[in-house]
């Protein structure tokens, strides 16, 4: 397990930005523009090594099954790989894809039937971190000023989003997250993601890196 490090005791109050580290920034920019999520993330060129499951997913919540299909289709057309075809479940309707840069995206709706045509509207974006100990990580984050919005024991925690944040932050057990996404739990190297906060840099006990956000306002990458 990666030991937590801290550069300051100053506390972030919410996740303000998400930066994906990619090998080919121009290719990634084209993909995310075509996928329709480019305004929700930032991109940074990086050659750091990463194999297997990176320990997180970005999840889109949309209005209905037709919109899930639309986003999955756009991702595949732009070069994504389907990990789980879009299908009904006990919780609604969802599909999982892996972007060409390796980031896993889940597109879901709680609705099992459409009440209108497909749109390109996103209701919510959630960054779900797969961690070894949800309670311990929750404590680290609350100690640094994040506010818990929902919590289900040691299984799941969701933090309150800032007014300017395009992405909500949540914690889930790493093994359970990998199972939900349809991938093996094993993975080594960098997570290839940097979380922007409102305080100084630190790295949590699962190796997720936070840095001070230059600006809380989201801008297209």
Indicate residue ranges for each PLM-predicted region:
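Glyoxalase I/VOC metalloenzyme domain signal
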Residues: 1-83, 98-153, 161-221
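Short, small/polar residue-rich loop motifs at catalytic or cofactor-binding pockets
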Residues: 90-92, 196-197
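Short beta-strand micro-motifs in enzyme catalytic cores
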Residues: 91-95, 155-157
């Amino acid at each position: 397990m990666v030991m937590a490090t801290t550069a300051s005791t100053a506390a972030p109050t919410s996740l303000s930005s998400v930066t994906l580290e990619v090998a080919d920034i121009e290719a990634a920019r084209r993909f995310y523009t075509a996928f329709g999520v480019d305004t929700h993330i930032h991109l940074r060129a990086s050659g750091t090594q990463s194999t297997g499951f990176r320990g997180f997913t970005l999840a889109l919540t949309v209005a209905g099954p037709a919109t899930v299909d639309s986003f999955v289709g756009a991702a595949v057309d732009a070069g994504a790989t389907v990990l789980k075809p879009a299908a009904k479940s006990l919780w609604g309707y969802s599909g999982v894809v892996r972007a060409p840069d390796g980031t896993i995206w889940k597109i879901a709706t709680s609705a099992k039937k459409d009440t209108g045509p497909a749109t390109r509207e996103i209701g919510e974006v959630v960054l779900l971190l797969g961690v070894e100990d949800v309670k311990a990580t929750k404590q680290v984050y609350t100690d640094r000023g994040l506010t818990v919005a929902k919590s289900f024991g040691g299984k799941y925690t969701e933090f309150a989003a800032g007014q300017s944040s395009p992405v909500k932050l949540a914690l889930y057990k790493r093994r359970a997250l990998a199972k939900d996404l349809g991938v093996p739990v094993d993975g080594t190297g960098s997570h290839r993601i940097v979380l922007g906060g409102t305080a100084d840099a630190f790295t949590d006990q699962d190796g997720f890196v936070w840095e001070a956000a230059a600006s809380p306002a989201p801008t297209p990458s």
